[in-house]
Amino acid sequence: MTCIAPLDIQGFTKLAPWWRTEIPTEIVLSGDGIGELFSMIAKRGAKAFFVIDSALQDQTSFARVFDQKEKFIFNATESEPRTGDVDALVEEIRASHADRNLLVGIGGGAAMDLTKATGICIANPLRAQD
């Protein structure tokens, strides 16, 4: 499949509704954000997959997240997430964690960007590189 990107904003607006997506987002900032997060997951009956910033590994308040089996630890010190990172994570989730119905990003901007891009690509048939 060949994809030709429009050269200007007017070209992008003609792509609608293809160029529209919604990402349900909830941001939790609190003294017990991790506890609240796990409570919300339990209330929803969700099966979460976590994308976690490796910089949080030594912080005890995040230990419960790092103890989860269903996780991917992203090292943002090496680079910002690339399309190849997104595609690899999508394939890992589809192959080994297909029962997960909630994607949770924890950490800084790179981990959050990777989580959002992965969520979009899981819901769509094309790769991020496409």
Where do the language-model regions lie?
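ATP/NTP phosphate-donor binding region
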Residues: M1-L102
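Glycine/threonine-rich beta-strand-loop-alpha-helix active-site module
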Residues: G84-D130
